[in-house]
Amino acid sequence: MKRFILFILIFAMIPLCPAKAEPIKWVDFGVPYESLKYAMDVDIATNEEEKHISWIDILAVSACRTGGKCPLSSVKKAAQDLKGDKSPEEILGNLYKFYSYYQEAYDAVLGGLLGSYAIESAGEWKSTYGLKAYFPIAAGYGYSHCDDFGNSRSFGFARKHLGHDLMGSLGTPVVAVEGGVVEAIGWNRYGGWRIGIRSFDSRRYYYYAHLQKDAPFAPGLKTGDIVQAGDLIGFMGRTGYSDKENTNNIETVHLHFGMQLIFDESQKECNNEIWVDVYNIVRLLADHRSSVKKTRDGWQRIYPYRDLDTEEFTPTGNKNFQTGFDKAPFLCYTFMDK
């Protein structure tokens, strides 16, 4: 009898322990460039107002109404609705059941692109709120691109292209789009010389591939290092499609740039990885480019940068990295040529 009562008590307590929510398993990010730009501009314009309208919220409301298509007209209406006194739940009514998904998904894609940062120019630090992520190709270097996400690839096995290719010149400096930790650096039979950088919030994994033969990476860069948005990380090339290391086997010089979303660590390397189309994000970043220069001693970032939103991270042994300014990490470096 006592055992029966104990069983009943345990069974009754089960509902009090909520089950862990399943992580998002798929994101189809198809927000048009014009909609991204409009939502971002509203976010920036209202940053210091009494009611700050987040571009994530704008896009999530629009996505609920349009099944993720987010045409500009819908985004404008969503922004106008959110400027009022109603909450997203009141605005959306029955469609609110989709809101948490789109809010989480879009925050995972865009969460590290907008925020507070500071740039040093003429010996003075100037802080601002706005687009703090950078275009992956350094300022002053030409490029061309098109929306090629999902195109077929055949090396090794038939598959879809899960990134975005930017064509350019051999040796073009490649910079980090967003700050984070270098998780992978070295050779891959598909991507050639490549770098993988995990965002500080761990939700985005940025992949930069087909880097230059012989000198693919910023000198001294290694696994575990901290990089900030706009930092030099490598040089454009055409390596890859080979089991033999340091081989040029890609016909056209280009950068393969990709973004993987990770809602749970089990998604990092699996058969159902979540890679999103970054074409319109790259277009959004095109007017925000980092300037680097070649000096007698190596490569140098012209305008030092500080991310004012990120907690302090301690680099793993690279003395070129420094931290400070109210514990916000920043980088003012010279990479020495070897």
Where are these regions (language model features)?
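Cationic-aromatic interfacial patches
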Residues: R3, P18-S100
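Hydrophobic core
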Residues: L9-M13
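Surface-exposed, glycine-biased beta-strand/turn segments
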Residues: D85-W193, A229, V282-K338
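Conserved, short, structured surface segments that act as functional micro-motifs
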Residues: D225-D297
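N-terminal Sec-pathway targeting helices
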Residues: M1-I8
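Structural recognition of the beta-strand scaffold that forms the well-ordered cores
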Residues: D165-M167, V174-A176, G196-R198, Y205-A209, ...
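Zn2+-dependent peptidoglycan hydrolase active-site motif and core
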Residues: V177-G220, K244-T252
